[in-house]
Structure formats: structure tokens, C-alpha cells
Amino acid sequence: MEDSAQDAVTAAPSGTPKSKLETLPREDLIKFAKKQMMLLQKAKARCTELDKEVEELKSKPVDGGTDDMIKVLTERLDALLLEKAETEQQCLCLKKENIKMKQEVEDSVTKLEETQKEFEQSHRNYVREMESVKNELIAVHSEHSKEKAALQRDLEGAVHRQAELLEQLKSQSDSEDNVKKLQEEIQNITAAFEEQTSCLQKQLEATSDEKQQEIIHLQKVIEDNAQHYQKDINTFQEEIVQLRATHKEEVNELMSQMETLAKEHEAAVNKLKENRVTLCETSETIPENYQCESESLNEDTSDASQENQKCSVALQEDPFAEHTVYDKVRQLEDSLKELESQHSILKDEVTYMNNLKLKLEMDAQHIKDEFFHEREDLEFKINELLLAKEEQSYVVEKLKYEREDLNRQLCCTVEQHNKEIQRLQEHHQKEISELSETFMSGSEKEKLALMFEIQGLKEQCENLQHEKQEVVLNYESLREMMEILQTELGESAGKISQEFETMKQQQASDVHELQQKLRTAFNEKDALLETINRLQGENEKLLSQELVSELESTMKNLKADNSMYLASLGQKDTLLQELEAKISSLAEEKDDFISKIKTSREEIDDLHQKWEREQKLSVELREAAEQAAQHNSELRQRVSELTGKLDEILREKSQNDQNIMVQMKTMTEDQEALSSKIKSLYEENNRLHSEKVQLSRDLEALQSQQDFAYKEHVAEFEKKLQLMVEERDDLNKLLENEQLQKSFVKTQLYEFLKQMRPSILEDNEEEDVVTVLKAVGESLVTVKEEKHNLVFEYDARVLELERRIKCLQEESVVQCEELRALVRDSEQEKILLRKELDEVTSTKEALQCDILEMKNTNEKTSLENQTLSTRVEELSRSLHSKNEVHNEKDLVIEHENLRLSLEQRESELQDVRAELMLLKDSLEKSPSVKNDQLSLVKELEEKIESLEKESKDKDEKISKIKLVAVRAKKELDSNRKEAQTLRDELESVQSEKDRLSASMKEFIQGAESYKNLLLEYDKQSEQLDVEKERANNFEHHIEDLTKQLRDSTCQYEKLTSDNEDLLARIETLQANARLLEAQILEVQRAKGVVEKELEAEKLQKEQKIKEHVSTTNELEELQLQFQKEKKQLQKTMQELELVKKDAQQTTLMNMEIADYERLMKELNQKLTNKNSKIEDLEQEMKIQKQKQETLQEEMTSLQSSVQHYEEKNAQIKQLLVKTKKELADAKQAETDHLLLQASLKGELEASQQQVEVYKIQLAEMTSEKHKIHEHLKTSAEQHQRTLSAYQQRVVALQEESRTAKAEQAAVTSEFENYKVRVHNVLKQQKNKSVSQAETEGAKQEREHLEMLIDQLKIKLQDSQNSLQISVSEFQTLQSEHDTLLERHNRMLQETVTKEAELREKLCSAQSENTMLKSEHAQTMCQLTSQNEALRNSFRDQVRHLQDEHRKTVETLQHQLSKVETQLFQLKSEPPTKSPASSHQPSKSLRERRTTDLPLLDMHTVTREEGEGMETTDSESVSSAGTHIQSLEQLLSSPDSKLERLTEASLWHTEFTKEELAEKLSSTTKSADHLNGLLRETEATNAILMEQIKLLKSEIRRLERNQEREKSVANLEYLKNVLLRFIFLKPGSERERLLPVIDTMLQLSPEEKGKLATVAQGEEESASRSSGWASYLHSWSGLR
């Protein structure tokens, strides 16, 4: 029994794997060792206490009333065990219900999340629709303004042309008559022109009114839609609020339930731990106690035997001594029984608690495994996300490079366009000057013709303007399409990201399920995969870092090269500096965005497709632009022609200048008033911008205050948490001290009892023990009450802290509401400011209309407008610069604020994550501290919720700021457009002034200023594009951050749900433990009552014990038998333990050992059940004792009834026989258990074989993995080789660029030297006279410099080409890198799919194996049945064959007889006959042939070798030609009469079975005999067949001889025919003889053909001579 107890104790730790203790850190091992030492000390103390109790029990005088006490206690213990089982079942039910409730809650949460996602999507769609409508309105407004500007420019061009024509007409006004006529004509033309202009203005006004009405209508529609959407949103928000309220209530209820369950679970866990400790202690002390008891019993038995020997002598002398001996024996027997019952109870408790311990350890292992696998899954997902982010960064870099290339191409095209415009203007001016010179010599008659032509050309100009407007509209529509495509790209990217997240979640769930299925078998594989992923991630990071560094270095080098090349051009220095600044800023932004922008893989494909579409659109746009440029060139040519013709007419308008001057004065006054208004509007604009800046600063201050307040709250919470942890530690220390005091008090009590024993009498001993026990119970109750009080105090403190936290949360919510109110106020102020801006824009539009009206008068004011134009230019520049500065400052401030807020958020999130990781580590390391850290987790949850709220508020603020920025940009655009219109007006005024002064130099200066303005406009547009790109990048970055926040929240929600599950389990265990404590208290109370009752019953039983003396001897015999059986059981237990040790040595896996130990524990439980049966037998023995008591009473009353007593003894002996039989049954059961163990061993071996199979599969999988790794290594090496090659190319290109730089430096130095020389030459030329001509040296230097400039241009082009080549090579490198990454990902996916397929194949193979087994069994059954059927059918066929054999034999006999007669007749005939005598049998043969065979055609039958005119020895007739029947054919045609007779004879009579059997035997014998005869006949048949062949050959020879004799008879006729054939000339007569020859000779078709050719005369005479002479000798038969 000692070994069994020790094995039961050691079984629990052996089930757990040893690797986990080895993997623990040093601190945890030290803690674990300390805990084990504490447990050992407690066990030792408990052992000492139990030893003391045993000694006390031994020293006590045992009364007879203990039996009833033991019965009651056993019954109570049984009831307690039943209650424990019931409580366990209730716990299981509660767990199942809890799981169901959790599932329902998760389902409801998923539904709510889905509804929230749907609502968010609908809200996003509404917002996008609103933005699209706004964009459309803005586009319409911009189109309207562009149309206005175009019309204004056309009007200005017409005015300029009129002014130029007037100037030209002044110079040619020679005669007054011509001038008068021209003035009249010009007045008519001007009236018509003014009418046309008025009509155009009216049309413009009408179109503007219509557009305004449309805009108003669209605004109304937008407002209606906005109201409708707001109503829908409000309804949805109300529904969401209701759902949230219901969800919160449900969650609160569930949380309350979970808390209660968690508390109960914690209590139960603590109780179970205590019980486990106590049971371990008791299990260790039980074997020692049992040894002590067994030794004491042996001593007692020895003493008792000696005393019995003594007493037997004394009893013979004294009857009183005999009575005392019997009393002592009874006392010893009672003590024995009590000890045995206690031993069995302790055994049951030990086994039960061991089972509980194993269950709890398995649960803990399961929880740890689940946590470990979840952690691995999260790490795997993180690696996947990092890979996706890196891939997306590469794609973004590609798109940026492509965009930069497109921008460069656009800049080049714009520059080329500007150059072409300049060339056309110069050409136009030259043509105007030439036409003006030629026009002076023209005649007056051409003027009238030109007038008509001018009218036609005006109409053509109008048509061309309409066409130009259509082209502009098409271009704007294309731009709108591009913008729509960009918006659609953004939307599709969002949708794709959502779909990718859902796909990720689905994949994560699928992967989680697969991992749960395959964790036991593929742990090593998971470790390998983790290492592979880590190495791949590091490799990719290193590659990306190397690529980024190389790219940065190459980019910097290229930028430096570009700056050096562009520095050589002096005119573009300023542009290069600005571009370098922009490029540096873009590079910094690029580095930032590369680290931040990381999206999914599927977006890459969509972006590539859309990029291709955009390229196609850009190509189409370029083609359209080229067409427009061609159209513009054609228009310019026409305009040049028209201007030449209009020059003559416009000279007559010189007189109208005086009137125009008067009107110009009025215009100047109006313009001054307008300038004052513009100044006031700009001041209002500045004021509004300053207010915006103040509002943004206030918002930043509020945000900073809020963050500071949150940080203070967090610090306070952390301090409170530290205080709580310290208090918890103090309470734990107090509890430990109290437990030590309890143990000390118990030891003192036991010592006190030992001291008091000798002085107290036997009667008073029991009362003192009861009093001490009561005092101990009362002390225990007080201690428990103190424990409960402490727990309640701790709970109250926790509640107070929770209340404080809630108050702080409410305060934070109030602060958030206040901040939101401030934000709303600021938004309202912004709305008011926007309204004011709208009013200002309306006033601006009105002013623009006024300006349009005043433009007609502006044409006359030329001299006084110079001062005004300068003032207006200065004002416009200053205002434009101020606006740009303010807008840039605002944008910079907003971006900095956004960056600061995002950095703060990221830092907070990192802090929270760090705290969560610390909590996880602490939970993993110390599971006993989980209950204490619940408050920490709750507070962290609250912090995270508050941070999430802050992030949401900040996101809303950021979105609002974005909207404000977009509006500000739009306002900037409108302001810039207005400034451009003002500049265009100023330029027109300057051009008018220049033309009035008639100086071409001033006109050229105006054109140059116009070019500068266009360049500035291009710069501003580029700046706008850059700012738009920055805004888009920031938006993408914010979207990525929001996605990361969502992912982190999802992970946090999962962790919180896991923590809640753990809390619920702990609470249920606590509740169970509390219930058990209450039950124990009730049992203790009942125990006290029972002890009192036992004391009363003891007095009654002392009298009855004296009567049991007679039955003690029989009981002793039974006890001896019982001990023997116990020894046998111990032997069996030892054997089982040996078997267990052998199994432990042989087994390979710890889990299988644990299963085997569980089975062994079940067997132990069965043994304990057997022990309980034995106890039942003992109870039956007690019942027999009661019967014996009744017999003793009868003995006192009736001593004479001894015979009746003997009968009762016989009955008792029968009962003993029954018990022996039951013991034999128990032995048989033990043998059955041994057989079960053997079967289990067989199953273990089978499972080991399966494990080996699985190992083989694992080895195969690992080999495949190694192959894949090698393939990956080879691909990586190839990639590195390509990278090295490309790096070498880059180095070569860098060297070329350096050489180019050196050459450029040399050229620049030469150019500077040339400048110095030119400067010196110019100084010398100034000193010389003006009349001297230029020297030839200067011309040579100029030519040399022009050559150098051409060479430099060529070098620049070469460098640009090399740059383009390097860029293309870089793109190819990137594409190859992307393809390699895709291959790598495909390989990973293929490995995963292959694993899944192999597993599916395994499952399918197993299922197919089972199916094949079942099919094999079915086919075996079917084959057996078929075999039986075939046997029967073959028997029937054999019978039929035997019958047919008989028939054939009879027919053959008849045929043989016939054949023999025929042969005899043939032999009797003579072999050689004369021709006359042989003619008769030939006739008979022929007649026979005619009857048997069909008629033969002589034409169709071919000759054989011996036929014709050859000898008679050779055979000429073929077997097919003769058709002689063979012997087999003759035999197969029997007589019908004989067949009928045989059939009639066979089927005539029916016989009995016996007769049939006799006939069968006789027929078999006859069949054998007939078989022999058949063989003999077959041999004779063969001989006969040979003879028949000889006879046939002879018959054929004779027939041929007869035929030849016939032919010899016909020789004379044939001779005559042949002679005629020979001697006739070739022609028709010969051809007539051919059929006769054919019938006579029976020619073959080939011979016929030859004769036909001879008859026609184609053969020669030589062929004739070799005709039939050779046949004559053979026919005679002499050869």
C-alpha cells in the first residue's frame, strides 16, 4: 500500500511534460521551489498532527458506541461525496450555459458590428456624393470663369487689332477725299462691329443668367438631399442609440453574472488547492500511519495471543478474569474496525483528490496551450501585414516616379508650346510690317474687295472661335473624367482594403481551425515556419534597406547632375533653385511616406490596371492636344492673312482716337473707385485669415490642456494601483501569519492534551476532548469570520476605487462635451465667415461685370493709364504674395498640428501596448496574481476607451480641418484667377500704350513680360499640384493610421474577451468553494450533535458488548481471512505497479502514458469499489452480530436451547461460504482486468505504429520543405547576382556622369573666359569709332562659341538619354524584384495548399481504404454466389455435350462407311486410261461439279503455274477454281433421318434417379471408350486425308489432259485465226479478232492489253515472231 500511495502522488507530475519546467526562467523556478518547500513543511506538520491524533485514539478507552458513530459518519461521508458529485455536475452545466451565453453575446456583437459597418458605409457614400456634387459645382464655376476670361481675351485682341489698323491708316491718309470715304466706310463697319459686340455681350449675360439659375437649382437640390440624408442619419443614430442601450444593459447583466461566476470559481479554486495540499499531506502520511497501525496490530495480536494463553490458564481458575479478558478483546476489535474504516475513507478521499488534481492540471495545460497558439497566430499575422506593407511601399514609389516623369513631359510640352507662340508672334509682326509697306503702294479699288473679304473672314473667325470653345469644353470634360477616375480610385481602394480585411479575418479563422487540428502533429513544423518567416522578414528588410539606400544615393547623384547641367544655363538659375528646394522637400516626404504607407496586395493589381487606363487617357489627351496645336497653327495662318487685309481698313480709324481719349479719362476715375473697393475687400480677407489663425491656436491650446489633464488622471490611477497592490501584499502576509499562528495553536493544544492525559480519569477524558475540540472549532469559526471580514473590506475598497474611476470617467466625458461645444462654436464662426466670403465673391462678380462694361471705354484711354497700371500691378503683387504667405502659413501650421497629434497618439498607443505586454507576461508567469490584476486590466480598458474616444474626436477635427483646407484652396484658386484676369487687363493696357506710341521695341518688352507672367503662372500651378499631392498623401496616411487603430482595437477586444472568460471561470470556482465551505460548516455542526448522541449511546452499548464474547472467535477467523485477501490484493497492486513501470519505460509519448495512468486510476477506483463491497459485507456482519445478540438474550432466558444456537451457527457458516464465493468472483474480475491490460497494450502498440507512420510523413514533409528552402536560396542568389550587375551598371553610369560634369566645368570655365574677352573687346570697340566694322576675329569667336553651344546641347541630350536609360533600367529592376516577391509568396501559398491537399489525401485514402474493404467483402460474397451458379451451369453443359458427342459419333460412323466405299471404288479404277475411256468419268465428275458448284467464268479464272500450253506434270487449276468439298464438310453434313431416329430414341422414356445414375456410369464408360475410338479414327482420318490429296491431284491432271486434247482438236481453227491476225495490217480488223483469240486461249487482262496494243500497230515485228511457236511443242505433250 505504501508503493501505491507514492505512485498515486507521483502520477500527477509525471503526466505533465518536463520541458515546461526547463523552459521557465530562473525567478519562476525559485518561486516554484519555495512553494514546494512550503507545501512540504505543511505536510510534515500535518503528519505530526495525525500521529498525535492516532496516539490519542490508541490511548483512549474504546467503547461499544463507536460502531454507530462510524455508521453515521460513513453515511454522512457518502452524502457529502454525492453532494460533491452533484456540485461538479452543476458546475459543468453552468460552464456549458456560460459558453452558450458567450456565443450568443459574440453573435450579437458581430451583428452590431455588421450594422455599424453598414451604417458607416452608407454615411461614407453620402459624404462622397456630397463632395462629388460640390466638385461639380466648383467645376461649373471654373468653366464659367474660364469662358468669361476667353471672351474677354478675344475682345481685347479685337481692340488691339483695331488700334493697330488705326495707326497704320494714319500713315496712309494722303488725300482728304479718300479719307472721307474711308471714314464713312469705317463708321459703318464700327457700327456693325459694335452691334456684334453688344449681341455677344447680351448672349454672355444670358448664358451667365442661365448658369446662375442652374447653380441655384442645383444648390436647392443639394439642400433637399442634405436634409433628407440628415433625417435618415438622425433616424439611424436613434436606432443605434437604442441598440447600444439594449446592448449595454445586456452586457452589464452578463458582466454581473460573469463576476459572480468568477468569484465563485475563484473560491472553488482556492478550496480545491487547499484540499489538494491537505490530501497530498494525508496521502504521504497514510502509508506511515498504516505501517504504524499494522505494527501496532501485530504487537496487539501477539500480546493478545500471550494474554490468551495466560488467560486460558487463569480462566480455568477464575471466571471473573475471563469476563475482563473478553472486554479487552472487544475493545481491541472495535478499535481495529474504526481504524480500518478511517483508512478506507482516507483512501477514497486521496483517490478523489488525485483525480481532481489531474483534471485541474490538464485544464491549466490546455489554457496555456491555447494562449501559446493564439500568440503564434498573432505573430504570423503581423509578419504577413509587414510583408504587405513593404510591397505597397514599392508600388507607391513606382507611381511617384511615373508621376514625376509625366509632370516633366508636361513641362516640356508647355515650354515648346510657348516657344511656338513666340515664334508665331514674331512672324506675325514681320508680316504686318511687310504688309504695311506693300499696302502703301496698293490702289483704292482693292479696298472695296477687301471689305467684303473682311466680312467673310470675320464669319470664319467666329466659326473658329466656336470650334475653339468646343475644343476647350472637350478638354475640360476630359479633366473632369480624370478627377472622377481619381475619386473612383480612392473609393475602390477603400473597398478593396475592407474586402482585404474581411478576407484576412476569414483566412485567420481558417488558419486558426487548421492549427487547432494539426498542433499535436506539426509543432516542429511551426517552429521551422517561424524561423523561415523571421529570416525572410530580415532578408526583405535588408534588401529593402539596401535598395532604399542605393536608390537614395542614385537619386542624390542624379539630382546633383541635373543641378550642374541646369546651372550652365544662366537664364534658368532661379527656376533650378526652386526645383531643387521642391525636390528636397519631396524626397523628405517620400522617405516619410515609404515608412508609413503600407496597403494590401490586391490593391496593387487594381492600381496597375487603373494606371494603364490613365496612361491610355493621357495618350489620347496628348493626341487631342497635338490636334489642337495643329488647328491653332492653321488659325494663326488665317489670322495672319486677315491682318494683312485689315491693315488697309484700320488706317482710317485714326480720327476716332480723340473721342477715345475723352472716354479714357472717365475710365480712370472709375478705376480709382474700383481700386479703393478692392483694397477694402483685401483688408477684410486679411482680417478673416487672422481670425482663422487665432481659432486654430485656441483649438491647439484646448487639445494640449485636455492631453495634460488625461496624463494627470493616468498618473493618479497608477499611484492608486500601486497602493492597492501594496495593500494586497500586506493582506497576504497577514493571512500567512494567521495560518502559522493556527498551526502553532494546534500544536500547543495537542501538547496540552498529552500533558493532561495521565492525570485525568478515563470517564472525564472524552468530555475534556470534546471541550477542546469545541474551543478549536470556535477559534476556527472566528478565524473564518475574520477572513470573510477582510475579504469584504477588500471588496469594499475595490468598489470605492471603481466608483472613483467612474466619477473620473464622467468628468472626462463632461470635459469632452465642453470641448465639443467649443468646436461647434468655432465651426459656426467658420460658417459665418464662409457666408461673408460668399458675399464678397458675389460683390467681386458684380465688379467683374462692371469691368466688362467698362472695357469698351478702356480702349480710348492710353496716356493717363500708365500711372494707374503701375499702381494696380504693385497692389496685385503685394496682395498675391500676402495671400500666398498666409495660405502657406495656415497649411504649414495645420500640417504641423496634425503631425504632432498623430505622434502623440502613436506614443500613447505604444505605451498602452507596452502595458498590455507587461500584463500578459505577468499573467503567464504568475497565474496566482490574476485575481489581483483584474483591477489593473479594468483601468487599462477604461484608459483605452478614453484614448479611442480622443482619437475619434481628433479624427473628426482633422476631417473638418481638411474641409476647411480644401475650401481655402478653392478660395485661393479663385483669387489667383482674379489676379490673373487683372494682370491680363494690365498687359492689354500696356500693349495699347505701346502700340499708340508706335514703337516695336516696347511691344517686344510687353511680350517678354507676358512670358514672365506665364512662367510665374506655371510655377504657381506647379505649387498647387505639389500642395494637392501633399494633401492626398496626408489623407492616405491618416487612413492607414485609422486602419491600424481598428486592428489594434480588434486585438484588444479579443484579449478582453479572453480575460473575461478567465474571470468567469475563476468566479465559478470561487462560488463552488464557498458552497463547499458552507457544507463543511454544516457537517461540523452535525458532527457535534452526533458526538453528543454517541456519548449517550456508548453507555447503552457497554452492556451489550459483554454479550458479544462468544462471536469474537468467529470474527477473528474472518479477520484472518480478510487479512490474507488483503495481502493478495497488495500483491496484485504491486504487480500492477511493476506493469506500470514497465509501461512507463516502453512508452514513447507522455500523453499516452497519462491515458494509461488514467486507466490505472479507474482500476484503483474499481478496487476501492470492491473495498466498499467488503465494507458492505462487514455491515452484514454487524447485522449478524445483532442477530447474535438476540440469540444471547435467548441464551440468558433459555439456556436449554443450545441446539437452536448451533443451527444459527450453521447459517453463519453458509454466509461465510457465500463470502468465499464472492471473493472468488473478485479474483476472476481481477483476471479480467489483467486481460484488459493486455488488450490495452496491443492498442498502445497499434498507436505506436500509427505514430511511426506519421513520423514518416513528417520526414517527407520536412524533405519537401528543405527542397523549397534550397529553391528559395537559389532564387535569392540569382537576385543578388542581378543586383550586383545592376550596381556595376550604376557605377559605370556614375563615372560617365562625372566625366560629363568635368567636361561641363571645363566648358563653363571657357565660357567665363570668353565673357571676359568679349567684355574687353566691347570696351575697346566703345573707344573706337562707331563707323568701324566688326573684326573678323569677333566673328570667328562667335562661330566658335556657337559650335561650343551646339556641342553642349548635344552633350545635354546624350546625358538626358542616359538618364532615361538608367531610369528604365531601374524600373526593370523594380519589376523583377516585384516578380520575385510574388514568386516567393506563391511558393508559400503553394506549400500551404500542398499541406492541405496532402492532409485531404490522407483522409480520402483512409476513407477509400474502408470503402475498399467493404467492397472487397461484398465482392467476395458475390463471387462465392457466382461460383456456385457457374458450377451448376457447367454441370448442365457437360450433360448436353455428352449427348451431342453421342450423336456426332454415330453420324461419323455412317460417313466413314460411305467414304471407305468411295475409296475402294477409286482404288479399283485403273490409273491410266485411253482418252476415249477416260472421257466418261470426266463427264461424271463435271456433272457432279455442276450439281455441287456454281458455274465458272473462264474469263474470271486466272491461270496457275502449270496451266496453258505447259506440261501435264504441273498443276494448273487452283483450289478455289475446282471447289472440291473437303472431308470435314462432308462429315459436318449428316443425314436428317439418322438424327431424327437418335433424338426419338433418346427422349422416348423418362427414368428414375437410380436408373439415371446407372446409365450415367455406363455412359461415362462408353464415352471413354468412344474417346479412344475417336482418337484412332482421327489418326486414320489423317492418313485418309493424305490419300485424298493424292487422288485429287491425279484427277486434276487427268482433267487438264482432256482439256488440252480439246485444244489440240481446235488447233487448226486457232492456226487460221492467228495467221490472219499476224498478216493483217494494224487496225480495226485485228481488233475484231481479239475476242475470238480471248475465248480460245482464255487470256488474262494483261495479255489482252498487250494484244490490243499489237492490233493497233504499236508493237514491233520482233514481238510478232516470238508469238505462239513455243507453245506448239508444249501442247503436243512430248516434253
UniProtKB/Swiss-Prot annotation:
GO terms for molecular function: identical protein binding. This is GRIP and coiled-coil domain-containing protein 2. Keywords: Acetylation, Coiled coil, Cytoplasm, Golgi apparatus, Membrane, Phosphoprotein, Protein transport, Transport. The modification Phosphoserine is found at residues 1474, 1478. Residues 35-1469 form a coiled coil. It is found in: Cytoplasm; Golgi apparatus, trans-Golgi network membrane. It comes from the Eukaryota. It is a peripheral membrane protein. Residues 1569-1679 are annotated as: Mediates interaction with RAB9A. It holds the Pfam family Rab_bind. GO terms for cellular component: cytosol; Golgi apparatus; membrane; trans-Golgi network. Residues 1474-1483 have a biased composition (Polar residues). Homodimer. Interacts (via GRIP domain) with RAB6A (preferentially in its GTP-bound form). May interact (RAB6A-dependent) with ARL1; might be involved in GCC2 Golgi localization. Interacts with CLASP1 and CLASP2; recruits both proteins to membranes of the TGN. Interacts with STX16. Interacts (probably via GRIP domain) with RAB9A (preferentially in its GTP-bound form). Residues 1-23, 1466-1522 are annotated as: Disordered. InterPro entries: GCC2_Rab_bind (IPR032023), GRIP_dom (IPR000237), MT-Golgi_org_protein (IPR051841). The modification N-acetylmethionine is found at residue 1. Extended rod-like protein with coiled-coil domains. The keyword Membrane applies. One of its GO terms (biological process) is Golgi ribbon formation. It comes from Rattus norvegicus (Rat).
